[in-house]
């Protein structure tokens, strides 16, 4: 049996941010795909079920895609340079469970990914340190 792969879809206007997120997610074992907008996710339910969506999109875009967002709310990670209590409450009401302030800290992204459950058959490699690598501060003890 061939194990399914984890996919990560990145939506962000900033090329540097997309590159940074792509490198982080590849390091965490994801096959990364950069997409232009939310509409490109339609018909990709199977891929998303076995992966995640990391996006910096306007709240109006999310409001226009509530039906899609509700299907993937547990695997949708919103990134934003401005995270206020008011915005967080509004997003939570829409079903967004994971919000990360930009610039994205790799340790926080990894922590959020660890909270996401992946379906059977989806290969989920360890997110721990690599052999011979230096441990993160939280891993030293």
Functional labels for PLM-detected ranges:
Residues 11-12:
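Conserved acidic carboxylate
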Residues 34-52, 59-60:
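Acidic, metal-coordinating helix/loop segments flanking the phosphotransfer/catalytic sites
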Residues 42, 61-74:
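Short amphipathic alpha-helix used as the core "switch/output" element in two-component signaling
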Residues 80-98:
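Alpha4 helix (beta4-alpha4-beta5 surface) of REC/receiver domains from two-component response regulators
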């Amino acid at each position: 049996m061939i194990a399914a792969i984890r996919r990560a879809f990145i939506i962000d206007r900033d090329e540097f941010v997309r590159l940074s997120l792509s490198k982080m997610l590849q390091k965490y074992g994801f096959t990364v795909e950069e997409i232009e907008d939310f509409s490109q996710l339609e018909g990709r339910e199977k891929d998303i079920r076995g992966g995640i969506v990391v996006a910096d999109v306007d709240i109006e875009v999310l409001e226009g895609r509530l039906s899609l967002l509700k299907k993937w709310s547990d695997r949708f990670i919103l990134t934003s340079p401005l995270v206020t209590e008011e915005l967080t409450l509004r997003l939570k009401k829409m079903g967004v469970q994971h919000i990360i302030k930009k610039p994205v800290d790799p340790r926080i992204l990894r922590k959020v990914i660890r909270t996401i459950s992946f379906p059977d058959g989806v290969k989920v490699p360890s997110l721990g340190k690599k052999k011979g690598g230096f441990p993160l501060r939280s891993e030293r003890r």
